[in-house]
């Protein structure tokens, strides 16, 4: 079920890029991607704060990540504009598998931006919140492009690669997986 469009800003001040989350939002706008669907969570809260500060980005909060995936697919089919799916770590990312498959089979461009646990916890098996081994490898077969971003410095280049394929030569779903620490680092 889709909730009403949610304008995530209170003041219209431009984002001064300081964090990985702000770099993600700036990259979306640079490639004219201005709409998205998703659920705020502990692992992507910095991203939602950056979205809140960006009045030109329209976001719809949904009740389930699968709904976000289908909404982004339908958004493109009805408007011709790419939308983003914002998914949280672990189960949230995996709930997007069915809509990603639909987008893949119909060559519908959709961009999935998912999160992962903190980089310091990746190699552990200590039971971090929403820890799911090899999330990117699970999603990779259902996307045309899948990449893990491990540093805020990589965000602009990775977005440029994804956007070139997403908006041009290789339509279909694309996935960017960002470590939680990438959103928080300067």
Where are these regions (language model features)?
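N-terminal alpha/beta PP-like core and its mobile active-site loop of ThDP/TPP-dependent enzymes
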Residues: 2-186
């Amino acid at each position: 079920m889709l909730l009403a469009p949610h304008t995530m800003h209170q003041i219209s001040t431009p984002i001064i890029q300081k964090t990985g989350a702000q770099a993600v939002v700036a990259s979306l706008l640079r490639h004219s991607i201005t709409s998205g669907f998703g659920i705020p969570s502990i692992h992507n809260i910095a991203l939602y704060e950056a979205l809140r500060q960006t009045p030109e980005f329209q976001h719809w909060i949904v009740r389930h990540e699968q709904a976000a995936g289908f909404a982004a697919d339908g958004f493109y089919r009805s408007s011709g504009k790419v939308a983003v799916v914002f998914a949280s770590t672990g189960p949230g990312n995996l709930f997007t598998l069915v809509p990603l498959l639909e987008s893949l089979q119909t060559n519908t461009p959709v961009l999935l931006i998912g999160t992962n646990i903190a980089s310091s916890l990746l190699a552990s098996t200590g039971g971090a919140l929403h820890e799911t081994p090899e999330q990117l490898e699970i999603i990779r077969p259902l996307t045309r492009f899948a990449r893990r971003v491990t540093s805020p410095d990589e965000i602009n280049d990775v977005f440029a690669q994804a956007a070139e394929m997403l908006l041009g030569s290789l339509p279909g779903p694309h996935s960017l997986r960002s470590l939680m620490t990438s959103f928080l680092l300067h």
